From Swiss-Prot:
The keyword Isomerase applies. One of its GO terms (cellular component) is cytosol. Catalyzes the interconversion of L-alanine and D-alanine. May also act on other amino acids. InterPro entries: Ala_racemase, Ala_racemase/Decarboxylase_C, Ala_racemase_C, Ala_racemase_N, Ala_racemase_pyridoxalP-BS, PLP-binding_barrel. Belongs to the alanine racemase family. This is Alanine racemase. Its cofactor is pyridoxal 5'-phosphate. The modification N6-(pyridoxal phosphate)lysine is found at K35. Pfam families: Ala_racemase_C, Ala_racemase_N. SMART domains: Ala_racemase_C. It comes from Albidiferax ferrireducens (strain ATCC BAA-621 / DSM 15236 / T118). NCBIfam families: alr (TIGR00492). One of its GO terms (molecular function) is pyridoxal phosphate binding. It catalyses: L-alanine = D-alanine.
Length: 374
């Protein structure tokens, strides 16, 4: 019998969240971001739920080949571009669009022997200082690309560092707008946070530059890009991944007794504890402290003690106080939607561990069985 733990990918939630992104940017086309194996969900598992997107944006050629193998004939964008010259041949063969963010990538294009000109997205470093040409060098890079016969069309791209924070996008937007004001080509600027928070209606003072394409990532997987200011529910998003496990043992813990490695939890009254078949080897964060929320049979309660490699412990007091029956075999929702419909947002689990929902999704371990359901 398999170990009682399972992740479920919700196709209907993916469809819903993609539609929610479109609602926020009705005049833009939508890149569905499926990098990092679709944020840990699995590209093949999310494809049906996201196939209404206008394009798929991802990181490397392997992911691009997987999307093409699923039958997708629309646009695919390599967000970091190519890493070596021979990658350009596969870009031609698979009809991929790719980002250009450095002189070396322009050099590769210039030396690439092809009869098929390629579409590129020229990246500006508008303030994040990660990838892209500085504003001072951006137009020179555009001019150089525009002179290459290997290049068909140049689109313009940047990435916001603080779309989810107090600093916002005003400064970066102004820099991008000034440098690109008379350059042709489609623009793509907005990630999940910018798409949801910084629409013309919500932020009229931002010096808004419309995106021809928006790039929702975390939002299409049902996590709030600006948690805890807003929850996923506030944004009308639904969890695309649920992680459940079952109680495999129970213990009565007396006053003064401890639970788990390091005795980090000591009971101040007698409690019943459930031992759950999930640990950090499954992708649940070891740093989640006592008090991290969980759902047991759809009733909200808390973890107690330190998370082990294969197990964690939960306080069953709230469940029994609510009149619920609980014991070995009871279902525990670590994040996502419980059988009774109650949702535990992945962000609520990530925050006590000092991380973000993105990391929990990406950290789902290969040993966890995954079911795709509508």
């Amino acid at each position: 019998m398999p170990r009682p733990i399972q992740a479920t990918i919700h196709t209907a939630a993916l469809r819903h969240n993609l539609a929610r992104a479109r609602l926020a940017a009705p005049d833009a086309k939508v890149w569905a971001i499926v990098k990092a194996n679709a944020y840990g969900h699995g590209i093949e598992r999310v494809f049906e739920g996201l196939r209404a997107a206008d394009g798929f944006a991802l990181l490397d050629l392997d992911e691009a080949q997987r999307v093409r193998a699923l039958g997708w004939r629309g646009p695919i964008l390599l967000l970091e571009g190519v890493f070596e010259l021979r990658d350009l041949e596969l870009c031609s063969r698979l009809d991929l669009w790719h980002t250009v963010h450095c002189d070396e990538q322009i050099d590769m294009l210039a030396s690439h022997k092809t009869k098929v000109a390629q579409r590129v997205f020229l990246k500006m470093n508008s303030g994040m200082n990660r990838l892209g040409f500085t504003p001072q060098r951006y137009r020179a890079a555009w001019t150089r690309l525009n002179a290459l016969p290997q290049v068909d069309e140049i689109s313009l791209i940047t990435h916001f560092s603080d779309a989810d924070g107090a600093r916002g996008i005003t400064e970066q937007m102004a820099v991008f707008a000034e440098v690109t004001r008379d350059l042709p080509g489609e623009r793509t600027l907005s990630n999940s946070a910018a798409t949801l928070l910084h629409t013309p209606a919500r932020q009229p003072g931002d010096g808004f530059v419309a995106s021809d394409w928006v790039r929702p990532g975390i939002a299409i997987y049902g996590s709030a890009p600006d948690f805890p200011q807003h929850s996923a529910t506030d944004w009308g998003l639904q969890p695309s991944m649920t992680l459940t496990a079952k109680i495999i043992a129970t213990q009565t813990v007396d006053t003064g007794a401890s639970v788990g490695y390091g005795s980090t939890f000591v009971a101040d009254k007698p409690i019943q504890v459930g031992v759950v078949a999930c640990g950090y080897a499954d992708g649940y964060p070891r740093l989640c402290p006592t008090g991290t929320p969980v759902l047991v049979n759809g009733i909200r309660t808390r973890t107690v003690g330190r998370v082990s490699m294969d197990m964690l412990a939960v306080d069953l007091s709230a469940v029994t106080a609510a009149g619920g029956q609980v014991g070995i075999g009871s279902e525990v929702t670590l994040w996502g939607r419980a059988a009774n419909g109650l949702v535990l947002g992945i962000d609520e689990v990530a925050q006590p561990a000092g991380t973000v929902g993105y990391e929990l999704m990406c950290a789902l371990a290969p040993r966890v069985p995954v079911l795709v359901a509508d």
